[in-house]
């Protein structure tokens, strides 16, 4: 399983579109804060419907913008080595932005996602949902390595809400 970092990533992946340094907080038609999701890919893997699914499934406290980046395994290996000291590809990494209105980036390894989907016996689009949700929870401050099961409980509830049967934390226990 991947991990999280507090380092800003937009500069590191160069995936986020250039824009102003200050971001406005996304709101719905009623002016209520909401989650805005942008999905970008540097390869052939696409994720139709992932942004909308994550917006509907995310916990209520998820407010602001998040970028979900689908990258080659080689790129996530570089990021994993740089930020976590692990010279291997992982499935998902989360990088909190630390700026108002922007939660951060969830980076998913396309090849790892394909392999894990095959092993789990489901479509790669399902795997992308599992990974994106897991990464988003890290952006919101959850840490399954230190929180005595709190993240696992939240992930399980949201996963059911979004129609998924198992999440990364349960898989990691097998």
Model-derived segments and spans:
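An acidic/histidine-cluster motif and surrounding catalytic segment
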Residues: 1-128, 137-174
């Amino acid at each position: 399983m991947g991990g999280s970092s507090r380092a800003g990533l937009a500069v590191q992946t160069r995936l986020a579109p250039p824009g102003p340094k200050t971001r406005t907080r996304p709101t719905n038609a009623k002016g209520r804060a909401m989650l805005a999701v942008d999905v970008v890919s540097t390869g052939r893997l696409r994720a139709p419907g992932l942004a909308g699914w994550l917006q509907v499934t995310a916990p209520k406290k998820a407010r602001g913008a998040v970028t979900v980046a689908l990258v080659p395994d080689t790129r996530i290996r570089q990021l994993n080595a740089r930020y976590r000291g692990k010279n291997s590809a992982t499935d998902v990494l989360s990088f909190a932005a630390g700026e108002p209105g922007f939660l951060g980036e969830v980076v998913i390894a396309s090849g790892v996602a394909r392999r894990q989907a095959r092993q789990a016996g489901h479509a790669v689009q399902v795997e992308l949902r599992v990974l994106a949700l897991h990464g988003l929870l890290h952006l919101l401050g959850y840490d399954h390595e230190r929180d005595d099961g709190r993240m696992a409980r939240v992930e399980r509830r949201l996963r059911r809400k979004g129609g998924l049967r198992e999440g990364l934390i349960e898989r990691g226990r097998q």
